[in-house]
């Protein structure tokens, strides 16, 4: 006679929470606590159930584990994860057969997933920026027919916000293309090498995008590697402007300036995006586009910045050498650098307030 389901669930949950020797792995296999060729284990993280498995070598939130199990058509784990507390409606994101759909209905799933739920799942997976999370997000969302139009609008908005200045989204841009660029940018930002390799293997046209991401995220060593050794290049004036669209990017701004980039153009781009740190660093390097910058600031409604650029109190920083091109030397130069002109405007502001 079989045990009541609730007791089976409790026993499996207890076993999965234990550290068992390799000699006892046969027990886990017999109990259905085996996934991706390794023991399936439970742990708690800030009150949330996490699954330890062989999938991408990372702990996975229980709800996300359910999505993967559904995508793999793994009937036993779908039931098990649901019994352990996974929200069955998450399954709607990865259902790909009618048999699985019927199983999920029996377990209480709705017919469709709300757009806000889809968006919440996406942001939940991407909350921790690791190679595993980026690859997982790719596997779940890429070419997914279960994604509705409203979610597409939400996701476009998220990408536009997170990559402000790096990407300009057009109505004609395909969601899949935008997703790949977003995941690649996050992989570059957080130095997720496995995710970069994964995306490079799947998509062969990302070299220029990677160069742009390196500029945007102030990654001078990788930028130097691509620009000089791999010979992936774009116009140096475009490069310095792109480096200026995100604030506090002294390394890549300096690097592009040393290559011949127009520092005044970098200054004006920084004004356009209200990147205060970049603006005054450009002035440190000799930028003097004050009139043009003031006009842009006025047009944008940046009143304090507009006023600041009318002041005759700035000058280039003579202590900064302007000809370094080695990333190690540039990093050493700017490691503890404090902008001369930023200090001047802060002192001025303090005195008049």
Swiss-Prot record:
**Which superkingdom, per the lineage?**
Viruses
- Residue ranges the record marks as coiled coil: none
Q: Name one GO biological process term.
A: taxis
Q: Which InterPro entries match?
A: ASFV_MGF360 (IPR002595)
Can you tell me which family this protein belongs to? Belongs to the asfivirus MGF 360 family.
Sum up the protein's function in the record's words. Answer: Plays a role in virus cell tropism, and may be required for efficient virus replication in macrophages.
Name the chain's protein. Protein MGF 360-13L
Q: Which organism is it from?
A: African swine fever virus (isolate Warthog/Namibia/Wart80/1980)
């Amino acid at each position: 006679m079989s045990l009541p389901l609730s007791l089976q669930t409790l026993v499996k949950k207890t076993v999965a929470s234990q550290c068992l020797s390799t000699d006892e792995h046969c027990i886990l296999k017999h109990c259905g606590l085996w996934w991706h060729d390794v023991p399936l284990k439970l742990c708690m993280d800030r009150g949330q159930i996490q699954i330890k498995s062989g999938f991408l070598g990372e702990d996975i939130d229980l709800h996300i584990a359910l999505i993967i199990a559904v995508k793999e058509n793994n009937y036993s784990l779908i039931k098990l994860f649901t019994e352990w507390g996974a929200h069955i409606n998450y399954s709607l994101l990865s259902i790909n057969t009618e048999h699985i759909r019927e199983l999920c209905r029996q377990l209480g799933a709705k017919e469709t997933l709300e757009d806000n739920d889809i968006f919440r799942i996406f942001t939940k997976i991407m909350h921790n920026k690791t190679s595993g999370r980026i690859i997982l997000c790719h596997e779940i969302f890429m070419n997914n027919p279960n994604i509705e139009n409203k979610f597409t609008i939400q996701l476009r908005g998220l990408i536009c916000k997170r990559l402000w200045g790096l990407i300009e989204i057009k109505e004609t841009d395909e969601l899949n293309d935008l997703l790949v660029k977003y995941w690649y940018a996050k992989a570059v930002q957080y130095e997720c090498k496995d995710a970069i390799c994964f995306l490079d293997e799947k998509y062969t046209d990302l070299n220029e995008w990677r160069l742009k991401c390196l500029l945007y995220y102030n990654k001078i060593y990788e930028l130097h590697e691509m620009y000089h050794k791999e010979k992936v290049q774009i116009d140096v004036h475009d490069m310095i402007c792109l480096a200026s669209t995100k604030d506090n990017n002294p390394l890549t701004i300096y690097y592009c300036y040393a290559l011949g980039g127009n520092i005044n153009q970098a200054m004006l781009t920084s004004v356009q995006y209200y990147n205060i740190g970049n603006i005054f660093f450009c002035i440190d390097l000799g930028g003097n586009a004050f009139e043009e910058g003031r006009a842009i600031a006025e047009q944008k409604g940046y009143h304090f910045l507009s006023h600041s650029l009318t002041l005759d109190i700035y000058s280039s920083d003579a202590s900064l050498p302007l000809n370094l091109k080695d990333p190690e030397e540039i990093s050493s130069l700017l490691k503890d650098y404090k902008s001369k002109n930023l200090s001047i405007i802060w002192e001025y502001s303090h005195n008049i307030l």
